[in-house]
UniProtKB/Swiss-Prot annotation:
Disulfide bonds join 13-118. SUPFAM superfamilies: Profilin (actin-binding protein). Belongs to the profilin family. PANTHER family: PROFILIN, PROFILIN-5. This is Profilin-4. Keywords: Actin-binding, Allergen, Cytoplasm, Cytoskeleton, Disulfide bond, Phosphoprotein. Occurs in many kinds of cells as a complex with monomeric actin in a 1:1 ratio. SMART domains: PROF (SM00392). It comes from Olea europaea (Common olive).
Length: 134
């Protein structure tokens, strides 16, 4: 299965029980910042934004004082899982980033999608990739 298929079929899909509700944008990105696959709506991000995210996975709390900057948008960092998941909120939307052995699974959402729904979609694929040794 191609990485693009994972994005299209497992991240940009309708959320279970909520037909028509889906993430705004999603991608699978290597730890080095290379994009493996992305939705057409996924924002272009800067290398320094990816560096900050990777630093936060290695040093949890690094982004909390400054916020999570991604694709030119600043998100307030909210409770995640140290070294495994970073979550950010901005207005009625937000971002979830799940770290696997080789990649970051990223999902961006706006209402009517809820933070919990975004977390579920992103983390389910991330957990699957971890189980596959990726």
């Amino acid at each position: 299965m191609s990485w693009q298929t994972y994005v299209d079929d497992h991240l940009m899909c309708d959320i279970e029980g909520h037909e028509g509700h889906r993430l705004t944008a999603a991608a699978i990105v290597g730890h080095d910042g290379s994009v493996w696959a992305q939705s057409a709506t996924f924002p272009q991000f800067k290398p320094e934004e990816m560096n900050g995210i990777m630093t936060d996975f290695n040093e949890p709390g690094h982004l909390a004082p400054t916020g999570l900057h991604f694709g030119g948008t600043k998100y307030m960092v909210i409770q995640g899982e140290a070294g495994a998941v970073i979550r950010g909120k901005k207005g009625s939307g937000g971002i979830t980033i799940k770290k696997t052995g080789q990649a970051l699974v990223c999902g961006i959402y706006e209402e009517p999608v809820t933070p919990g729904q975004c977390n579920m979609v992103v983390e389910r694929l991330g957990d699957y990739l971890l189980e596959q040794g990726l």
